[in-house]
Amino acid sequence: MFFDDEFDVIVVGGGHAGTEAALAAARTGARTLLLTQNVETLGQMSCNPAIGGIGKGHLVKEIDAMGGLMARAADRAGIQFRILNASKGPAVRATRAQADRSLYRKAVREGLSAQENLSLFQQTVVDLIVEGRRAAGVVTQMGLKFRSRCVVLTVGTFLAGRIHIGLENYDGGRAGDPPATDLARRLRDLGFKVARLKTGTPPRIDRRSVDFSRMAEQPGDDPTPVFSFLGTREEHPPQVSCYITRTNERTHELIRAGLDRSPMFTGVIEGIGPRYCPSIEDKVVRFAERDSHQIFVEPEGLDSLEIYPNGISTSLPFDVQLAVVRSIQGFEDARITRPGYAIEYDFFDPRDLRHSLETRHMENLFFAGQINGTTGYEEAAAQGLLAGLNAARKARDLEPWWPGRDEAYLGVLVDDLITRGTSEPYRMFTSRAEYRLVLREDNADLRLTETGRALGLVDDARWSAFEAKREAIETLGARLAARRIRPDSSQAESWNALTEIPLQREASLLELLRRPDVGLEHIAGHAPDLFEGMDRAVREQVEIAAKYTGYIERQQAEIERVRRYEAWQLPDSMDYGKVIGLSSEVREKLGRVRPATVGQAARIPGITPAAISLLLVHLRRTGAA
């Protein structure tokens, strides 16, 4: 039976990737359907109750800059906010919010309900409607068929998901939810290259059984930062502290004694886990020289009786989990409310995707989130936004869009996946971005909001606020450039008292701001009239631009140099066997990845500068350059 309505875009899965995908498609005007197993779990935080962090916060800001929901939901649900790396340079500073799970889920549901052009339907998807090599809709478990121009799969850990606790295991998409076994089988039958990954979660603990007095308190920042460029502190719920404790040698002895019943160390689990978020048993084995590991004790919510012990993800048997938890300071009398577990699931080789996140093997089918081998809410949400946008554009026969590595962390994320692939869950870090000085959290709106507006993602309210901010930045910069100080003036004496190098020539306040020992607060103290009506975000942008102008200019010059490679397009049908001089290994890699540009080809592991030179010679000789 076919559903009455047809859609431009169908999104399968209501997690962080799915919600952003559905919202992005609908914001551009596409008739969008979001299909989920359970509408009550839309936007659910399946693992840790937090948004942001190093590299991840940058993605959240970029999602927000393009009209996405994640940052606004974090502002409405955040019960502790911190700026990580606050003492370091602006490129690596990152916002992190501890979130109330219930409030976050509520904010996501309200955002979905308020979105025009978006419908919700609760059913498990078991099959795709395929016409030739094109996706044309989906089929649900009760045989209901939905037709659409494009389909976006954002199915998280549900594809053939299997949950492990000790040597016991069972099918599941996450604790309490069934897996998507039929859909996983169908995708395998369609010829997609599949492998297995695993992730895990720690046991939850009854907060009433925890002695917080034996732990170190970790309060949030004051004043609290906001996540969204449109956010305000007034939106934040009451703020609370987290706590820190540590494992000890007794903890490690218990873990080592239980390894003979660990699914990881007995070969039961075959999937590869996240390198940068390993289980506690993995940490104890890999870092045997360490006598303790830090645990962040995080509240699950203002009204929740559960806490999340971040740092002891485990799939050990329950009796070992309980002994391990009670060996930790502050947890001596702890009661576990839910055991930790590991989950194995299918993912598909992201090198089989285009930069738009459309699959190469099947037209009109897009993948986003953990199905592509990533880990983390933020990585999933960013992919969801891109896939939803491009599915909507494909449905209307428009060209796809994606950001470059020099434009957004989202561009770095997608290019890494498409070009390099991954054999382990991929997590974003600032170190993955070669142009991180220009890809800061603080300027995500300046980088992406204008593009988002052109793509139909940014509404009038956000655009108006952005234009006002951009104008204020230009105004303040012009004011500082116009106000000048002569070395023989009375003002120069007060400036010389602030700096190690006396003023030798006439200089503008903007030039003075470039000095490392002069801050904007010094200038504001001497010329407060210049700062009337200028908020903190505007002042911050002007100061960063002044302080780092030389570094930014050099990075921009490097970006322009590299862009020349990106301008050389490579046809998808290119026969690399005809490129004279390439080794068989290089030909195989180029044929496997099928890079879209010479720049992407240069980033494929094992492709040498000599091979790129041969490729350029071939392009010029054949008239393709």
From Swiss-Prot:
The keyword tRNA processing applies. GO terms for molecular function: flavin adenine dinucleotide binding. Signal peptide: none annotated. GO terms for cellular component: cytosol. NAD(+) binds at residues 273-287. Its cofactor is FAD. The keyword Transmembrane does not apply. FAD binds at residues 13-18. One of its GO terms (biological process) is tRNA wobble uridine modification. NAD-binding protein involved in the addition of a carboxymethylaminomethyl (cmnm) group at the wobble position (U34) of certain tRNAs, forming tRNA-cmnm(5)s(2)U34. NCBIfam families: mnmG_gidA. HAMAP family: MnmG_GidA. This is tRNA uridine 5-carboxymethylaminomethyl modification enzyme MnmG. The lineage of its organism: Bacteria, Pseudomonadati, Pseudomonadota, Gammaproteobacteria, Methylococcales.
